[in-house]
């Protein structure tokens, strides 16, 4: 069952910001250089776009407005052909297809909720001619295992340059097993300022996810051989299956502040066309761009249990609390500076070239070991401490400098490509290497559009902190 509401009303057009460069303003501009930008569709009332990693290049992101099978969009299976998860919407999930798995975060506890977390690469930005509102509500399941999801987005333009908006996503799922429910809340405020010479996209987001934990079933035969345990019952409620523990929660919280901006350098070219008043039209020709991106993340994780039975699952306990209360947190600040030569910056150059440097600072906070407590050769506590004067946490700092470059061709249909390389130059991740690329070609096949696309990467990276 689903309810959907969509209201449309405000709009602006993304300006053409990637016209190719001409070495002289007196030269004629070929028609190929006057084609619309990949993120400029002036005929549409609403345009949705996303940003490329680190550099913030805008590209069109299709907006799903199809009502056919809309209810399936909430299902976890809508994210991949094969997903492993805990039966209900909002539970930790991971795709089973290798090439769909993303590089793990240093804060690995958020990886299990990747489908529900907004990042700079999956965040939507908008350009509207009329105010736009979309509210969706989906629900499913019986009263004992009901799942509800409410999503909404509101955005509008102020003139042709400024767009602001906000969105929220709320999931409440009771789960199909004992101690299997979850509650997820996330929201985001975003905005953009786009002119020929200056572009800015920014957002701040926050999420708070709470997930009940049960450690799994005590007997897998309830799933593998349910008839053997039915005891002459036709149906057994899955909520009655015995689990390893209850009264246990896993809370993951996070916030993010993201801003990317660029200043385009170039010149103004007069066209042969005139406006309604008879003035000669002018178009800005960008040659290069100076780019700055700042990304700050703050994440926290807390694992709480009031069930004494959890001691049978985790034989080694850390700390002196009567109940389990494990906490950790981290933050990282990433600054990227880049210089880009726009695609077609010379008549012979049918590609764009970008060089960048990234400075990343990370801090992790863990519960400290108790002085006087014998942790043994494996680090596990085995005796009472001799003192209670001990710090509550320990802090670990990391810093890394990366350099990299990108070669891309995003215009045209016959052949487009993008190749990016990144090297950890100094610091905690010195020696890290990332090389990734994609290639796409389009052609006619039996009078139909056909596309062939290839992707690949080579990585040599350090393990996540945890």
Q: What are these model-predicted stretches?
A:
Residues 1-16:
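Single conserved hydrophobic/aromatic residue that forms the stacking wall/gate
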Residues 14, 128-130, 244-307, 312, ...:
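Exposed, low-structure sequence patches enriched in small/polar residues
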Residues 21-129:
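Acidic, small-polar-rich N-terminal luminal/periplasmic segments of exported/outer-membrane proteins
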Residues 38, 140-142, 171-190, 244-253, ...:
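Outer-membrane beta-barrel proteins
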Residues 82-85, 176-184, 190-255, 446-466:
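Outer-membrane beta-barrel translocator/channel fold
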Residues 105-111, 119-153, 175-176:
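Short strand-turn segments of transmembrane beta-barrel domains in outer membranes
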Residues 131-141, 164-176, 414-427:
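Transmembrane beta-strand segments that form the barrel wall of outer-membrane beta-barrel proteins
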Residues 149-173, 435-437, 441:
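Hydrophobic/aromatic-rich, well-ordered segments within soluble, folded domains that form packed cores
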């Amino acid at each position: 069952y689903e309810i959907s509401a969509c209201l449309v009303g405000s709009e602006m057009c993304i300006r053409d910001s990637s016209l190719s460069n001409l070495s002289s303003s007196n030269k004629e501009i070929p028609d190929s250089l006057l084609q619309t930008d990949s993120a400029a569709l002036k005929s549409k009332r609403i345009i949705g776009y996303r940003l490329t990693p680190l550099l913030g290049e805008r590209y069109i992101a299709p907006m799903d407005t199809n009502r056919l099978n809309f209810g399936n969009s909430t299902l976890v299976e809508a994210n991949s052909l094969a997903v492993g998860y805990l039966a209900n919407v909002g539970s930790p999930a991971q795709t089973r297809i290798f090439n769909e798995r993303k590089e793990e975060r240093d804060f690995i506890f958020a990886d299990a909720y990747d489908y529900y977390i907004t990042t700079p690469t999956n965040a939507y930005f908008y350009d509207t001619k009329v105010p736009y509102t979309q509210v969706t509500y989906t629900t499913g399941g019986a009263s004992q295992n009901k799942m509800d999801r409410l999503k909404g987005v509101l955005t509008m333009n102020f003139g042709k340059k400024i767009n602001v908006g906000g969105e929220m996503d709320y999931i409440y799922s009771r789960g199909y097993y004992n101690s299997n429910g979850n509650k997820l809340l996330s929201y985001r405020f975003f905005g953009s300022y786009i002119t020929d010479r200056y572009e800015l996209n920014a957002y701040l987001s926050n999420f708070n996810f709470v997930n009940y934990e049960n450690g799994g079933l005590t007997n897998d035969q309830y799933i593998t051989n349910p008839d053997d345990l039915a005891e002459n019952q036709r149906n057994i409620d899955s909520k009655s299956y015995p689990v390893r523990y209850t009264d246990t929660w896993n809370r993951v919280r996070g916030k993010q502040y993201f801003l990317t901006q660029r200043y385009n350098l170039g010149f103004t070219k007069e066209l042969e066309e005139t406006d309604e008043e008879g003035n000669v039209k002018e178009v800005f020709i960008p040659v290069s761009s100076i780019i700055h991106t700042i990304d700050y993340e703050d994440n926290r994780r807390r694992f709480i249990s009031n069930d004494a039975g959890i001691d049978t699952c985790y034989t080694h306990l850390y700390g002196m609390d009567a109940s389990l209360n494990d906490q950790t947190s981290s933050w990282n600040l990433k600054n990227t500076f880049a210089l880009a030569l726009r695609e077609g910056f010379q008549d012979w150059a049918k590609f764009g070239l970008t060089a960048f440097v990234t400075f990343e600072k990370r801090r992790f906070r863990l519960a400290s070991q108790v002085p006087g407590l014998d942790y043994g050769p494996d680090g596990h506590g085995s005796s009472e401490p001799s003192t209670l004067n001990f710090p509550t946490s320990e802090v670990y700092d990391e810093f890394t400098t990366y350099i990299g470059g990108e070669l891309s061709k995003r215009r045209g249909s016959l052949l487009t490509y993008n190749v990016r390389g990144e090297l950890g130059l100094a610091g905690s991740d010195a020696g890290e290497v990332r090389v990734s690329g994609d290639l796409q070609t389009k052609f006619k096949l039996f009078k139909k559009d056909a596309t062939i696309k290839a992707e690949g990467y080579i990585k040599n990276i350090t393990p996540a902190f945890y």
